[in-house]
Amino acid sequence: MKAVVLTLAVLFLTGSQARHFWQQDDPQSPWDRVKDLVTVYVDAVKDGGREYVAQFEASALGKQLNLKLLDNWDTLGSTVTKLREQIGPVTQEFWDNLEKETEVLRQEMSKDLEEVKQKVQPYLDDFQKKWQEEVELYRQKVAPLGTELREGARQKLQELHEKLSPLGEELRDRARTHVDALRAQLAPYSDELRERLAARLQALKESGGASLAEYHAKASEHLSTLSEKAKPALEDLRQGLLPVLESFKVGLMAIVDEATKKLNAQ
């Protein structure tokens, strides 16, 4: 039952045409990778659940109950597969439409990010260069102290610590200075990127084409369609579960009745 619940929880994210993600020859979109991962997980849960059912039926309690769960499990698996096939095209259409309708915005934001990246890259390179120089300078100052320690006695450890502490503090202070300088240099570009994003979203709201409100309306429409498409398939799944639950109930009641009779006879 746990496997069934897990399967239902994720089958809405996957389509019927998904393939294993490690078998792809062509580059995949993010949606395809997510769907393939979910499909692999669902298959693993389904196979693992069938193994547990088989082990239970082989046990003494399973033989006594005689629920024939394995037959019902295979039937249930077919029902779940059918459900995925029915809902798969609807979810695929939803993701395709969402990706298509936000393509322009994503392209514009990628362009903005690339422009800002090119502007700040010199500052990042300069920061990295200065940091490497500071580390090298620190290493040069510390190296003689290490030699002194190897050549000296144990009592010089305290002296070494006293000499290293100022050097460590100096490195920390110089690094903090460089970080503060970098932060000040990048601040205008961070503000610029934030303003660009705000402008893109504002233009999207005011445009005569696809707006954020339209995205929300279309998403709601697709989700409503998905819900309507899923109702018959979910009802089929519920009907497939009924024999399993009824068989379990009958078998359990038989065991309870038998145990009650034995207790009364004693």
Swiss-Prot record:
Subcellular localization: Secreted
Region (10 X approximate tandem repeats): 67-266
Statement: the UniProt record of this protein carries the keyword Phosphoprotein: yes
Keyword Repeat carried by entry: yes
Gene Ontology MF: a single term: protein homodimerization activity
Repeat (Sequence) residue spans along the chain: 67-88, 89-110, 111-121, 122-143, 144-165, 166-187, 188-209, 210-231, 232-242, 243-266
InterPro entries: ApoA_E, Apolipoprotein_A1/A4/E
UniProt PTM comment: Glycosylated. Palmitoylated.
Residues bearing PTM Methionine sulfoxide: M109
One Pfam match: Apolipoprotein
GO terms of biological process kind: acylglycerol homeostasis; cholesterol efflux; cholesterol metabolic process; lipoprotein metabolic process; phospholipid efflux; positive regulation of cholesterol efflux; positive regulation of phagocytosis; positive regulation of phospholipid efflux
Entry keywords, A to Z: Cholesterol metabolism, Glycoprotein, HDL, Lipid metabolism, Lipid transport, Lipoprotein, Oxidation, Palmitate, Phosphoprotein, Repeat, Secreted, Signal, Steroid metabolism, Sterol metabolism, Transport
Signal peptide (from-to): 1-18
GO cellular component, as recorded: chylomicron; extracellular vesicle; high-density lipoprotein particle; low-density lipoprotein particle; very-low-density lipoprotein particle
Source taxon at top rank: Eukaryota
Family: Belongs to the apolipoprotein A1/A4/E family.
Record's function text: Participates in the reverse transport of cholesterol from tissues to the liver for excretion by promoting cholesterol efflux from tissues and by acting as a cofactor for the lecithin cholesterol acyltransferase (LCAT). As part of the SPAP complex, activates spermatozoa motility.
Summary of subunit composition and partner proteins: Homodimer. Interacts with APOA1BP and CLU. Component of a sperm activating protein complex (SPAP), consisting of APOA1, an immunoglobulin heavy chain, an immunoglobulin light chain and albumin. Interacts with NDRG1. Interacts with SCGB3A2. Interacts with NAXE and YJEFN3.
Protein's recorded name: Apolipoprotein A-I
Gene, per the UniProt record: APOA1
